[in-house]
């Protein structure tokens, strides 16, 4: 039965990722080219009506193809560049090629993260098989593709302890789309455990400075207008576009009590992850950890790469689970995280593939239905609670080493 041992080794031995990953990238490049060739692009208006083409600096007066601009400054710069690179939005084909390259670069970064975390090769095919993910990138040209690249580059940098670069890249991603704020709790935990309180606060200041520097042209003109539009936290979402909460009905979806309930669940889940998983490397109870941290007695820890990736992606998925409304483009953040989280949750490979397929079906159902939205929420809950229930393995399979202070890089 040597062939059985060979198949098992190919599926479970992480050393095979080194040669499998380039083959998957090559195959996916061919698939992207085929999609661009055969499927009409759906993002012509997005390229042809870019708001910054008029050089307007008052954020309250800038409009895009779908109405008032509601994204931060880096989004404006990114799509201004795209607007000019595509001959003022007329060369849609070249725009698709650019987003296909963006997709493939992000895939390479994701594969690097998977390899460094020791993930088994049987997860890798799931990283290139998503119909919805290809649509988000090469057919819809959403800014979420740019933000997702920033997210994964930041995760890779955090895994390799490049703290300053990681925070700068992450904050730039936040300036493309606020979804990346969902990583903030994880970043706080990882940096505090690795560097202690003072350096972590310094990195937080750096993140704010990146936002200020990117927004200077708009802050000089109308700072209140920029902050209210770019970082609007009270935005009312339209029920007809929701992917996740359609099954609760429009009245509940639009109610303030539902929004507050989701916020409360989000806070409780973050606390549960912190107590049962994220902070256990501190080797003390939560009250003792806080006391030691404030008193300057916290002993820094060299965190293993699988732990860092698990903390980052679990923070992301908890945030998506408790989001007021998810739209189809949000799959850019979730799709590549799901296989890893299901693996860390300890699911059998067959069950893992089944959950992935159900999630993929739900996100490809347009418009969303009660059933598809239930599956979206259940799949997110399965990933979040699965990792939480399996926290002993999900966060502690690798030993950490006490160390002195780690320097910013």
From Swiss-Prot:
Pathway: Protein modification; protein glycosylation. GO terms for biological process: dolichol-linked oligosaccharide biosynthetic process; protein N-linked glycosylation. It is a multi-pass membrane protein. GO terms for cellular component: endoplasmic reticulum membrane. Disulfide bonds: none annotated. Residues 1-18, 83-91, 159-167, 220-257, 324-335, 395-409 are lumenal. It catalyses: an alpha-D-Man-(1->2)-alpha-D-Man-(1->2)-alpha-D-Man-(1->3)-[alpha-D-Man-(1->6)]-beta-D-Man-(1->4)-beta-D-GlcNAc-(1->4)-alpha-D-GlcNAc-diphospho-di-trans,poly-cis-dolichol + a di-trans,poly-cis-dolichyl beta-D-mannosyl phosphate = an alpha-D-Man-(1->2)-alpha-D-Man-(1->2)-alpha-D-Man-(1->3)-[alpha-D-Man-(1->3)-alpha-D-Man-(1->6)]-beta-D-Man-(1->4)-beta-D-GlcNAc-(1->4)-alpha-D-GlcNAc-diphospho-di-trans,poly-cis-dolichol + a di-trans,poly-cis-dolichyl phosphate + H(+). It is found in: Endoplasmic reticulum membrane. The keyword Transmembrane helix applies. Keywords: Endoplasmic reticulum, Glycosyltransferase, Membrane, Transferase, Transmembrane, Transmembrane helix. Its EC number is 2.4.1.258. One of its GO terms (molecular function) is dol-P-Man:Man(5)GlcNAc(2)-PP-Dol alpha-1,3-mannosyltransferase activity. InterPro entries: Glycosyltransferase_ALG3. The chain crosses the membrane at residues 19-39, 60-82, 92-112, 138-158, 168-190, 201-219, 258-278, 303-323, 336-356, 374-394. Residues 40-59, 113-137, 191-200, 279-302, 357-373 are cytoplasmic. Belongs to the glycosyltransferase ALG3 family. Dol-P-Man:Man(5)GlcNAc(2)-PP-Dol alpha-1,3-mannosyltransferase that operates in the biosynthetic pathway of dolichol-linked oligosaccharides, the glycan precursors employed in protein asparagine (N)-glycosylation. The assembly of dolichol-linked oligosaccharides begins on the cytosolic side of the endoplasmic reticulum membrane and finishes in its lumen. The sequential addition of sugars to dolichol pyrophosphate produces dolichol-linked oligosaccharides containing fourteen sugars, including two GlcNAcs, nine mannoses and three glucoses. This is Dol-P-Man:Man(5)GlcNAc(2)-PP-Dol alpha-1,3-mannosyltransferase. It comes from Aspergillus niger (strain ATCC MYA-4892 / CBS 513.88 / FGSC A1513).
């Amino acid at each position: 039965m040597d062939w059985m041992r060979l198949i098992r080794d190919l599926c479970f031995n992480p050393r095979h990722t080194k040669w499998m990953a380039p083959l998957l990238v090559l195959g996916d490049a061919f698939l992207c080219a085929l999609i661009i060739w055969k499927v009409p692009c759906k993002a012509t208006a997005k390229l042809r009506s870019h708001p910054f083409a008029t050089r307007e600096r008052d954020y309250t007066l800038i409009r895009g193809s779908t109405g008032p601009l509601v994204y931060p400054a880096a989004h404006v710069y990114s799509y201004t560049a795209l607007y000019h690179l595509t001959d003022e939005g007329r060369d849609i084909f070249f725009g698709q090629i650019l987003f296909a390259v963006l997709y493939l670069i992000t895939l390479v970064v994701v594969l690097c993260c998977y390899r460094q975390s020791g993930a088994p090769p049987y997860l890798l095919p799931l990283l290139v098989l998503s119909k919805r993910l290809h649509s988000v990138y090469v057919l819809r040209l959403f800014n979420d593709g740019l933000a997702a690249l920033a997210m994964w580059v930041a995760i890779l940098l955090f895994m390799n302890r490049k703290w300053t670069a990681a925070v700068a890249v992450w904050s730039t991603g936040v300036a493309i789309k606020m979804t990346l704020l969902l990583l903030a709790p994880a970043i706080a935990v990882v940096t505090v455990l690795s560097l202690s309180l003072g350096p972590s606060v310094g990195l937080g200041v750096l993140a704010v400075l990146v936002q200020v520097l990117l927004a200077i042209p708009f802050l000089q003109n109308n700072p209140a207008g920029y902050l209210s539009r770019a970082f609007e936290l009270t935005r009312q979402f339209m029920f007809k576009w929701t992917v996740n909460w359609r099954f609760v009905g429009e009245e509940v979806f639009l109610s303030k009590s539902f929004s507050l309930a989701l916020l409360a669940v989000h806070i409780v889940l973050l606390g549960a992850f912190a107590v049962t998983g994220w902070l256990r490397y501190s080797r003390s109870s939560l009250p003792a950890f806080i006391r030691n941290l404030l008193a300057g007695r916290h002993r820094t820890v060299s965190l293993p790469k699988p732990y860092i990736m698990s903390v980052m992606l679990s923070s992301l998925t908890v945030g998506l689970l408790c989001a007021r409304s998810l739209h189809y483009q949000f799959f850019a953040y979730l799709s590549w995280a799901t296989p890893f989280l299901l693996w860390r949750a300890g699911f059998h490979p067959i069950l893992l593939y089944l959950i992935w397929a159900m999630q993929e079906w739900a996100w490809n159902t347009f418009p969303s239905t009660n059933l598809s939205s239930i599956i979206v929420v259940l799949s997110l809950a399965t990933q979040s609670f699965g990792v939480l229930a399996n926290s002993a393995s999900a966060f502690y399979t690798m030993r950490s080493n006490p160390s002195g202070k780690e320097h910013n890089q």
